[in-house]
Amino acid sequence: MRPPRSNTKAAFSSLQFGLLCLLLLVNNGIKSVQADAFTDYFSDYDCNQPLMERAVLTATSSLTERGPDKARLNGNAAWTPVENTYNHFLTLDLGDPRMVRKIATMGRMHTDEFVTEYIVQYSDDGEFWRSYVNPTSEPQMFKGNSDGNSIHYNVFEVPIIAQWVRINPTRWHDRISMRVELYGCDYISENLYFNGTGLVRYDLRREPITSTKESIRFRFKTAFANGVMMYSRGTQGDYYALQLKDNKMVLNLDLGSRVMTSLSVGSLLDDNVWHDVVISRNQRDIIFSVDRVIVRGRIQGEFTRLNLNRELYLGGVPNVQEGLIVQQNFSGCLENIYFNSTNFIRVMKDSTELGEGYLFTRVNTIYACPSPPIYPVTFTTRSSFVRLKGYENSQRLNVSFYFRTYEETGVMLHHDFYSGGYLKVFLEFGKVKIDLKVKDKARIILDNYDDQFNDGKWHSFVISIEKNRLILNIDQRPMTTTKSMQVATGAQYYIAGGKDKNGFVGCMRLISVDGNYKLPQDWVKGEEVCCGDDVVVDACQMIDRCNPNPCQHKGLCHQNSREFFCDCGHTGYAGAVCHTSNNPLSCLALKNVQHVQQRVNLNLDVDGSGPLEPFPVTCEFYSDGRVITTLSHSQEHTTTVDGFQEPGSFEQSIMYDANQLQIEALLNRSHSCWQRLSYSCRSSRLFNSPSEAGNFRPFSWWISRHNQPMDYWAGALPGSRKCECGILGKCHDPTKWCNCDSNSLEWMEDGGDIREKEYLPVRAVKFGDTGTPLDEKMGRYTLGPLRCEGDDLFSNVVTFRIADASINLPPFDMGHSGDIYLEFRTTQENSVIFHATGPTDYIKLSLNGGNKLQFQYQAGSGPLGVNVGTSYHLNDNNWHTVSVERNRKEARLVVDGSIKAEVREPPGPVRALHLTSDLVIGATTEYRDGYVGCIRALLLNGKMVDLKEYSKRGLYGISTGCVGRCESNPCLNNGTCIERYDGYSCDCRWSAFKGPICADEIGVNLRSSSIIRYEFEGSFRSTIAENIRVGFTTTIPKGFLLGFSSNLTGEYLTIQISNSGHLRCVFDFGFERQEIIFPKKHFGLGQYHDMHFMRKNGGSTVVLKVDNYEPVEYNFDIKASADAQFNNIQYMYIGKNESMTDGFVGCVSRVQFDDIYPLKLMFQQNPPKNVKSLGTQLTEDFCGVEPVTHPPIEIETRPPPLVDEEKLRKAYNEVDSVLLACLLVILFLLLILMFFLIGRYLHRHKGDYLTHEDQGADGADDPDDAVLHSTTGHQVRKRTEIFI
């Protein structure tokens, strides 16, 4: 029955490009949903029917009773291959082409055998297979099951349309075991065939298109690289041009702004295989997708509405049109062309019956899709070839074919002449060359074309040889070579190799020998076709690995048949995919890694590997440590403003050397930024000060970063409506708020620094009140560059002070490509810096042995690792940088910006890293092998992670800043603190003390006969400034404490206690004998005293410090000719020297002469020979001084892990249910047992006749006596007579 005309009108009206809801779902490839939520996505009406009821299932292999027929979803068994390898396929033949929307999988019931990840492939003929790909053109890895019993669904957001579907398991648990179901519906196709001269025209004059949103989707297949697929234009300059150009899909459009926007997607689209196209526009945002590879763009210009009011063409145009870059009409098939939700081909078919045929014009088109007689052949290896027959002993040779390849080398044709010699056509560096050897003639090499033909496009090739002439024709460009030669052809022609191991790898079609063309399907395997499956007939199985471009940051992609390569030379980035920046993150980052000059011009990359490009700046390094970054612009010179009277009539936009996103990144990372702006004026007002907020009408103003007119001048405060002089009260006219507002005929100036980062930089300046060019009014402005100081990236520092402390970041989606940059500072030899895991994948960076960094990861296959060893220590408590990158080709580790190492990915599909755990910084995910030290500047894919914010949350073992245990100087008495961050140790080598904090005394208790001598070895020591220290205690106020002498010069120094109990120093350093007495204290009272003797000022000043008294300085007048140096010191004595009879009696410790500690040396194990006791044997003593101790380090305890309340509640609910059931069962059993025992007790005598007649009469002698003594008695009542 014919539908009403109004409905048809509505259908045609819907052609006016509305929004296709289906396309809006195409954003991220695949949605995984659980079984209980699946009905929320599709209803039965939405194409959601099981498709495998009558499907035929086959597999590459299977175990007994686990064949492919067992792989149906609701079966009790499952398909299991013989071996667990990656090369197994489960193939589903659906009988007819179907639209597949969803797949469901299960494992083997009641076991742990299930598939966790798989690839889906589909085919139109069961021979040529294509993988379902993600938006980056990589095979999509579908998530599988987590156990053997539950169902897991995956939704194909762009449906699969095919008859054959096969599943390739890539990851599994225990064994590969699968049960499968596909959901979808029958596929009804509406086809339209174009032969290269045809087209369809739809008249839009009656119903023009005016839309802000539209969507188009269709399928096509073709064997030709160029052709117009869809075109329309309007009278206002709008046009919409969809076309094939060099086997890529190109969309050019203009919304009337006279600026064309061009998008390109897809590659190798002329392979005569169906391709899915989806285009969706929402105002100026557009999505363009071919075979699920998505390109997003933004239409140039200001307009958002598409106006088309002429014709809409499909398959071609009658003449050249604006926006078209190809001239050929389309050759091939279009299927199910949907404008919004209306099938255009169906409407066109019905239009004649409905009387709407006048709207459509069809030229040389049919409603069908015949297969073209073109059968490509793929040579997959260099050893594969085809051997075809020709006319033997012919005087002419003619061979033609089409070829496409990505290889630079390979033999395409080899023929041995019957008359002797040969012909070889080969590729060398992508150029086609001819190697010709004719009998009795010299061998010649023909190189006639400068072009390279290994670009993946189809190229035509024809070669013909006849007497004295060779004609080579490539892409319709003939080259003739004339040479004396005569050939007789042989019988065999080797195509793509055969005689040479370096065969051709790529595709060929229409191979003709001597004018004869034989269909590839008719070639005889083994006789004409070599190497079995290495030659694929009726398919061109080439992969364009450069589309979409895997090289980041505009790197140039090249490829061969196995892999791609990136040329990063012009990008400023490095690595296999141009991911890692060669430019520093900031000026401070440059200073941290290398020596710098005072001023350096360079490019900064503020986000590292992120999307922002490098931009030029000037770095200024000052002696006080300040680092300033200067960003220039185009208007830094002083500019005169004259002849602009109206407020803001003069406008100057400022163009910086960076775009807005780059500038915002620089501002956000800097500690402070400022920009100087000044205006010099003569009788030209700046503001209209003073003024109220509602009456502020300035003559001039500047524009902020967000295009906001600002109400204050540089140097003032936001909202003040003043200049700097108005804030300070120093304006030329005290009644005004700006100098220029005084309207003086003298030159005045208002200027200052704008320091509010939220408004910087200045986008534009506007000036007025400068009169006419003939009057005296005039102004001059100067805008300086944007200057910034500091980098918050390097002040974002945290300290890990406990080995199992960690910062848990959200899961890091490293995917196919990602990088992590950080700087660390530690003294630890072995630790894990970061770690993250997934179900099978993981990443881990660890420090090993103090001088080697190791990055380990696993992405589906076995674990891989890359190591960087250094010739220096990485645990030297200095900052070191590390950059970790993993991409499609390799993993890369860079240490300190220069030491690099890589590990290549294994051949085959590159799997994305699937990480589900937190990214744990500072330990493993189990909080083991922890890191202690400092970490800063953590960047994930170029984005800074605010570690300080995490530390402010009070995390266990984490501190803000880089604060070690040695910051508080815990080591005393010149001890050297060795940082460990979770603790510390003290090196007392340069101290007269020992102990954990160099606070334990090393002393000796001296008697009158005790003497200790230290002999200076080697060259004699001479000093002009000494640092001498000695501690002592005594109750006998006399004696020699410490002395130095030289027998060579007679010079000496003696420190002793005088008989009066005072400290006395006597010395002679060559200028004259001197004696110093410290009279303020009596030193013989048994107290401990600490004395320092020092010289300075060229030996003319002696400083004597005792205990906590103020130092006393003694100055000596030494002549310029005198020698104040203590020359050739030979001996140091403690207690007395050899010339004395009685020595010091008491305890001496802390003996130090510069860097010599004699008591420490004498009491160490294996003491040196130059220090010894010459008197009685001495033992070490602490002289009654208790060592200083520090409070113990507070012990922290890791808090209990956070528990998901929902999961906990669910777990408790499950446990409660189980416990309740168990308790009920136990109570029921106890009740049964209780009833049983009660019944048994009540019925324990049932069935027995029992009496108590013998009770009490067991020992009776006779029956009468037994009756009398029995308990029951003889039942004769004894009568009693009572008297009342």
UniProtKB/Swiss-Prot annotation:
Sites carrying a glycan are: 195, 329, 340, 398, 668, 974, 1047, 1137
Which residue intervals are topologically Extracellular?
36-1217
* Residues in F5/8 type C domain copies: 47-185
**Database matches in InterPro entries:** ConA-like_dom_sf, EGF-like_dom, FA58C, Galactose-bd-like_sf, Laminin_G, Neurexin-like, Neurexin-related_CASP
Its record classes its membrane topology as: Single-pass type I membrane protein
Annotated ranges, domain EGF-like = 542-579, 962-999
What are the GO BP annotations of this UniProt entry?
axon ensheathment; cell adhesion involved in heart morphogenesis; cell-cell junction organization; dorsal closure; establishment of glial blood-brain barrier; heart process; nerve maturation; presynaptic membrane assembly
Q: Chief location of this protein?
A: membrane
Q: Which UniProt keywords apply?
A: Cell adhesion, Cell junction, Cell membrane, Disulfide bond, EGF-like domain, Glycoprotein, Membrane, Repeat, Signal, Transmembrane, Transmembrane helix
- Identify one Gene Ontology CC term for this UniProt entry: plasma membrane
- Which pairs are disulfide-linked? 47-185, 333-369, 507-540, 546-557, 551-566, 568-578, 934-962, 966-977, 971-986, 988-998, 1147-1183
In this protein, which residues make up the domain named Laminin G-like? Answer: 220-369, 403-540, 824-962, 1032-1183
Residue ranges annotated as transmembrane are: 1218-1238
Which SMART domains does the entry link to? Answer: 4.1m (SM00294), EGF (SM00181), FA58C (SM00231), LamG (SM00282)
Q: In which tissues is it expressed?
A: Found in septate junctions of epithelial and glial cells.
Which N-terminal residues, if any, form the signal peptide? 1-35
In this entry, the parts of the chain located on the Cytoplasmic side of the membrane are 1239-1284
A matching Pfam family: EGF
Query: Record's Gene3D superfamilies?
Result: 2.60.120.1000, 2.60.120.200, Galactose-binding domain-like, Laminin
The protein's location, in the record's own words, is: Cell membrane; Cell junction, Septate junction
The entry's family comment says:
Belongs to the neurexin family.
The family database entries (PANTHER family) matched by this protein are listed as: NEUREXIN-4 (PTHR15036:SF91), PIKACHURIN-LIKE PROTEIN (PTHR15036)
On assembly, the entry states: Forms a complex with Nrg and Cont. Forms a complex composed of septa junction proteins Nrx-IV/Nrx, Tsf2/MTf, Cont and Nrg during late embryogenesis. The C-terminal region interacts with coracle. Interacts with Patj in cis form.
Q: What is the recorded function of this protein according to its Swiss-Prot or TrEMBL entry?
A: Seems to play a role in the formation and function of septate junctions. Septate junctions, which are the equivalent of vertebrates tight junctions, are characterized by regular arrays of transverse structures that span the intermembrane space and form a physical barrier to diffusion. Required for the blood-brain barrier formation.
Provide the protein name. Answer: Neurexin-4
Gene (UniProt): Nrx-IV
